[in-house]
């Protein structure tokens, strides 16, 4: 066994002359453990939010939409099949789905709620999103055949609506002078509930494309726009649409980044801030090791003097106390990693338990894109936290170890 390591290990396990050394060592280990555990849990939560953003937002919302330009004389797109043929020339585009979109007031008795209604074709929509996976009770399979409204679960809860209930859509209409006329009232049956466990549940509803066109008195080839699925969602801003340069209608594109990109930026920003904050916390805890080692050096200076008289050089003495500091840091790291892993793997359940006890949601679904705290443990994060904590422990050990190596054995032994 490495002799300096063995001696430092015996010092760790042996009884200290000064009990304050052991007390400070315990507090430094606790501080490191808490910092490591919190950092692992925090990073796992950020990973969980990123996963849910991919699965519940990017899998549901279109990566890009082609719409009629706001200043165009015609607010809708006619003969959309011609537009589809042109877009298919771009290999970046993996799916195209026509849609009709409008804002309506949902009425159920005396309760009202403003919703964004989108009319889609099931088969085409399946090519651009996974929204069918979030429609409950096999409602997506019956969507096109039976018609009716797929309503967000948050809207259904607020309006006290269940599957099979009839509600009324109040749809505003424009006359030829582009002035709003008396809204039309369209009764429609709720055939299924859409549950994404987040913000979209409180603002989103789906209709079959043909039914939506009928409500708006559109022609069969008349739509609001087309949804696009791209091979790389992050290339949406640089999508090549040169094939539409000579299209007979003014069009424009909007992408998911303009709507939801802030969520990705916020997650990355919080992750960075969390790294900095927790490294500082671990750093403060690690520098308790400085105090521990300085006191340990003073406690063991007689042993150091004896080893120096027996031939131990400066490097030998320095390695003893570097190992001493690393072992103190490793103890806190291991405790923190075990605690952090257990909490990260059970974070969602743990938070749900707290919500059950206090009787309140910590994350409101109508504010955040998910209404629960997700978690996903990445072992690379655990390794990075371990390396960072050990590196800080090593840095904290260097100064006290150097002081131990500079002790003069003659002075120490003469004072004993």
From Swiss-Prot:
Query: Which cysteine-cysteine pairs are annotated as disulfide bonds in the entry?
Result: none
Q: Name one GO cellular component term.
A: plasma membrane protein complex
Q: Where are the transmembrane segments?
A: 21-41, 276-296, 334-354, 379-399
One GO BP annotation of this record: lipoprotein transport
What keywords would UniProt list here? Answer: Cell inner membrane, Cell membrane, Membrane, Transmembrane, Transmembrane helix, Transport
Principal cellular location given in the protein's record: membrane
Q: Which Pfam families match?
A: FtsX, MacB_PCD
Q: Which InterPro entries does the entry link to?
A: ABC3_permease_C (IPR003838), Lipoprotein-release_system (IPR051447), LolCE_TM (IPR011925), LolE_gammaproteobact (IPR011926), MacB_PCD (IPR025857)
Protein name stated in the entry: Lipoprotein-releasing system transmembrane protein LolE
What gene is behind this protein?
Answer: lolE
């Amino acid at each position: 066994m490495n002799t300096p390591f063995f001696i430092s290990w015996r010092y760790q396990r042996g009884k200290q002359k000064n009990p304050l050394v052991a007390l400070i060592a315990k507090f430094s280990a606790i501080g490191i453990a808490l910092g490591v555990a919190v950092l692992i849990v925090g990073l796992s939560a950020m990973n969980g939010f990123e996963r849910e953003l991919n699965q519940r937002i990017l899998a549901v919302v279109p990566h890009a939409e082609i719409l009629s330009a706001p200043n165009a004389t015609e607010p809708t797109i006619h003969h959309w099949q011609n537009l589809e043929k042109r877009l298919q020339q771009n290999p970046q585009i993996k799916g195209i789905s026509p849609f009709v979109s409008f804002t309506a007031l949902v009425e159920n008795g005396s309760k009202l709620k403003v919703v964004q209604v989108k009319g889609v074709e099931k088969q085409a929509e399946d090519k651009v999103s996974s929204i069918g996976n979030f429609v409950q009770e096999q409602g997506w399979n019956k969507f096109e055949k039976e018609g009716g409204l797929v309503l967000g679960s948050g809207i259904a809860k607020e309006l006290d609506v269940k599957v099979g209930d009839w509600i009324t859509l109040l749809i505003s209409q424009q006359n030829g002078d582009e002035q709003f006329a008396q809204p039309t009232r369209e009764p429609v049956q709720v055939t299924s509930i859409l549950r994404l466990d987040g913000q979209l549940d409180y603002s989103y509803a789906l209709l079959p494309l043909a039914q939506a066109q009928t409500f708006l008195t559109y022609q069969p080839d008349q739509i609001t726009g087309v949804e696009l699925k791209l091979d790389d969602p992050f290339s949406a801003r640089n999508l090549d649409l040169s094939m539409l340069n000579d299209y007979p209608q003014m069009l424009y594109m909007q992408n998911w980044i303009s709507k939801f990109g802030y969520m990705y930026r916020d997650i990355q920003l919080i992750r960075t801030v969390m790294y900095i904050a927790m490294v500082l916390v671990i750093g403060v805890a690690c520098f308790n090791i400085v105090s521990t080692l300085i006191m340990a050096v003073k406690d063991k200076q007689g042993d150091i003097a004896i080893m120096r008289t027996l031939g131990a050089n400066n490097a030998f003495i320095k390695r003893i106390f570097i190992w001493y500091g690393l072992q103190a840091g490793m103890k806190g790291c291991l405790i923190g990693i075990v605690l952090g892993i257990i909490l990260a793997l059970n974070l969602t359940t743990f938070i749900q338990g707290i919500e059950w006890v206090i009787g309140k949601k910590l994350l409101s679904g109508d504010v955040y894109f998910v209404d629960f705290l997700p978690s996903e443990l990445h072992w690379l994060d655990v390794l990075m936290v371990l390396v960072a904590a050990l590196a800080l422990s090593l840095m904290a050990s260097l100064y006290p170890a150097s002081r131990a190596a500079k002790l003069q054995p003659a002075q120490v032994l003469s004072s004993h």
